[in-house]
C-alpha cells in the first residue's frame, strides 16, 4: 500500500479535532451535572380525614356484611335465649327492664367489642397493619371507620332483640327510638375498647381472650339486675362502657321516663367512647410502627 493511501485511511479513522471552546465547556457541564443532583419528585398530599373515614367505613361495612352476618345471627339468638331463660325468674318491674336493655346492648358488645378485638388482633399477627400503614390515610380514620362499621352493623340485631324482649316481658315499645342513639354511642365505646385490646395484645390468642372476657363482663354486669348485686360488683359495673347505654335504654321503659337522666347516661357513654377511640388510635400508631 502506498504512502498516499495509508495517509487517507488514517485521516478517515482519526477523530475530528474538538474546538478549544467546546473542550473547555465539556468539563464545566460535567461539573455542573454533578453539582445539580436530580431532585426527588414531590409526594402526593395526604388524604383528608373525612373522605378517608368514609372510604374505610364503606369497605369495612361491606366486609362485615359478607363475613359477619352469621355471627350477628348468633349474637341475636344468644341474647334472645338469655331473655327466655330470665323470663322464668323475672316477672316484671325494674328487673325486667334491666334484662331487656342488657340483652339488647349485649348484641353490640358481642360484635363491636369481641369481634373487633379479634379482627385487629388478627391484623397485627398476620401483618395486615402494614397494608393500612402504606395507605395515605390518617390512622384515626382506620380505627374510627372500622369501629363505626362494626357498631352500625349491630343495629338490626339490637332492634330485633329489643322487640322480642318487650313482647316477652310486656314492656312498652314507645321508647325503642332511643336505640338510634344508644347503639352508636355504646358501639363507639365498646368498639374503641375492642380495638385497643386487639392492638395492644402481644399475641392473637390474647386478643381473642380479651374480647371474650369483655363480652362476658358485658353479659354478667349488663343483663343481671343491679339491685341484686354486691357493692363491689356494682362499682365494677360502673366502669364498663356499655353500662350507661343499658341504663339509658332501661329508663325509657318507665311510665314517665326521666329524660334528663337518659341524656346524662348517653353523654357519659359518648365521652367514654371518645376516650376509648383515642386510646385505640394511639394503639394503632404504636402497633403500625413496630
What are the roles of these predicted feature ranges?
Residues 139-140, 144-211, 259-266, 270, ...:
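Alpha-helical transmembrane segments and their short interhelical loops
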Residues 85, 96-168:
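Hydrophobic alpha-helical transmembrane segments of multi-pass membrane transport proteins
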Residues 222-277:
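Membrane-interfacial helix-loop-helix junctions in multi-pass membrane proteins
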Residues 66-92, 97-112, 213-219, 271:
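Hydrophobic alpha-helical transmembrane segments of multi-pass membrane transport/permease proteins
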Residues 2-39, 86, 167, 254-256, ...:
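Junction motif at the cytosolic side of a transmembrane helix
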Residues 58-77, 263, 289-290:
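Membrane-interface helix starts
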Residues 33-55, 232-242:
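Short, membrane-interfacial amphipathic segments enriched in basic
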Residues 87-90, 201-243:
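Transmembrane helix segments
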Amino acid at each position: 500500500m502506498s504512502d498516499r493511501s495509508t495517509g487517507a485511511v488514517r485521516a478517515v479513522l482519526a477523530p475530528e479535532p474538538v474546538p478549544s471552546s467546546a473542550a473547555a465547556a465539556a468539563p464545566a457541564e460535567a461539573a455542573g451535572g454533578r453539582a445539580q443532583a436530580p431532585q426527588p419528585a414531590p409526594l402526593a398530599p395526604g388524604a383528608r380525614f373525612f373522605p378517608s373515614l368514609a372510604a374505610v367505613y364503606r369497605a369495612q361495612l361491606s366486609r362485615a356484611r359478607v363475613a359477619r352476618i352469621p355471627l350477628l345471627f348468633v349474637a341475636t339468638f344468644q341474647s334472645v335465649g338469655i331473655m327466655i331463660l330470665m323470663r322464668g325468674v323475672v316477672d316484671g318491674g325494674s328487673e325486667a327492664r334491666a334484662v331487656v336493655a342488657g340483652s339488647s346492648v349485649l348484641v353490640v358488645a358481642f360484635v363491636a367489642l369481641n369481634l373487633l378485638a379479634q379482627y385487629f388482633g388478627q391484623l397485627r399477627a398476620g401483618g395486615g397493619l402494614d397494608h393500612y400503614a402504606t395507605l395515605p390515610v390518617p390512622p384515626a380514620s382506620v380505627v374510627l371507620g372500622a369501629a363505626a362499621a362494626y357498631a352500625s352493623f349491630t343495629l338490626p340485631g339490637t332492634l330485633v332483640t329489643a322487640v322480642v324482649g318487650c313482647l316477652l316481658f310486656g314492656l312498652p315499645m314507645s321508647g325503642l327510638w332511643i336505640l338510634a342513639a344508644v347503639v352508636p354511642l355504646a358501639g363507639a365505646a365498646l368498639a374503641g375498647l375492642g380495638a385497643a385490646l386487639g392492638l395492644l395484645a402481644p399475641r392473637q390468642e390474647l386478643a381473642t381472650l380479651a374480647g371474650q372476657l369483655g363480652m362476658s363482663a358485658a353479659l354478667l354486669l349488663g343483663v343481671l339486675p343491679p339491685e341484686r348485686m354486691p357493692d363491689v360488683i356494682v362499682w365494677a359495673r360502673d366502669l364498663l362502657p356499655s353500662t350507661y347505654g343499658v341504663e339509658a335504654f332501661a329508663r325509657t321503659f318507665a311510665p314517665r321516663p326521666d329524660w334528663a337522666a337518659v341524656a346524662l347516661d348517653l353523654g357519659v357513654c359518648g365521652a367514654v367512647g371518645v376516650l376509648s377511640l383515642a386510646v385505640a388510635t394511639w394503639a394503632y400508631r404504636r402497633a403500625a410502627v413496630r
